Curated annotation (Swiss-Prot):
This is Pyridoxine 5'-phosphate synthase. 1-deoxy-D-xylulose 5-phosphate binds at residues 11-12, 47, 52, 102. One of its GO terms (molecular function) is pyridoxine 5'-phosphate synthase activity. 3-amino-2-oxopropyl phosphate binds at residues 9, 20, 190, 211-212. Its EC number is 2.6.99.2. The keyword Lyase does not apply. The keyword Signal does not apply. It is found in: Cytoplasm. The record marks 153 as: Transition state stabilizer.
């Protein structure tokens, strides 16, 4: 079996729930189904505008999950306070714009480097691992290393939207550089069965984060079957 871990993002279960302001589908139940069908960890993005995941969702997931919780947040004081209270296994810092439909790209680490120094130190002081969601760019990885980030997650959106050898080469080179810098390398955004199979073959990538596609597949085939199939797809890359 592949050593690639599968993180399942369940944000859009909350989107469906919030469309009618009801308490179903139950995000805890979906998370448990995901885990029972191969999810190695659960990812949620608590956005500043609370458009899908709510604060209570995060606390409930943390208290009930038998696998690690990966909490995506913007690097703000409000989110830092919530993360410290929740104490997830890992916090993934992502850029955020209120008008965007989804995260549009990686962090510009250099532009907020000084701010991130104390932000990351604070998370580490509570034994929370830190991931930086970045473009597959060598300079961003070097900055992540200086910040003592535990992991980076390479933004695969550009490759998924334009599956050229050039875009894939950027990811391959970035993952190799992470290895040389002793930073754990994850990848995610826009992945489907086909693109996930390709990215899972990239040396030194240890985890994939996949959400929207799996939730869409769940409409047709069920959440359990969709996650199980994805797990088999990335496992078959050995």
């Amino acid at each position: 079996m592949s050593s690639i871990a599968l993180g399942v993002n369940i944000d859009h279960i909350a989107t469906l729930r919030n469309a009618r302001n009801v308490d179903y589908p139950c995000i805890i139940e979906v998370a448990n189904i995901a885990v029972n069908n191969g999810a190695d960890f659960i990812t949620v993005h608590l956005r500043e505008d609370r458009r899908h995941i709510m604060d209570d969702d995060v606390f409930r997931l943390k208290s009930s999950l038998k696998v690690p919780l990966n909490l995506e947040i913007a690097a703000t004081d409000e989110m830092l306070s919530i993360a410290i209270e929740v104490k997830p296994k890992c916090v993934c810092l992502v850029p955020e714009k209120r008008q965007e439909l989804t995260t549009e790209g990686g962090l510009d680490v250099g532009s907020i480097f000084s701010y991130l120094v104390s932000f990351i130190e604070k998370l580490h002081s509570y034994d929370i691992d830190v991931t930086l969601f970045i473009e597959p760019d060598i300079s961003q990885i070097d900055l992540a290393k200086k910040l003592h980030a535990n992991n980076v997650e390479l933004h695969t959106g550009k490759y998924c939207n334009n599956a050229t050898q050039n875009e894939l080469s950027k990811i391959i080179k970035a993952a190799e550089h992470c290895h040389h810098q002793n930073i754990t390398c994850h990848a995610g955004h826009g992945l489907n069965y086909q693109s996930a199979a390709t990215i899972a073959k990239v040396p030194y990538i240890s985890a994939l984060n996949i959400g929207h596609f799996l939730i869409c597949e769940a409409v047709l085939h069920g959440i359990g079957k969709s996650i199980y199939k994805m797990k088999q797809v990335i496992a078959s890359t050995d």
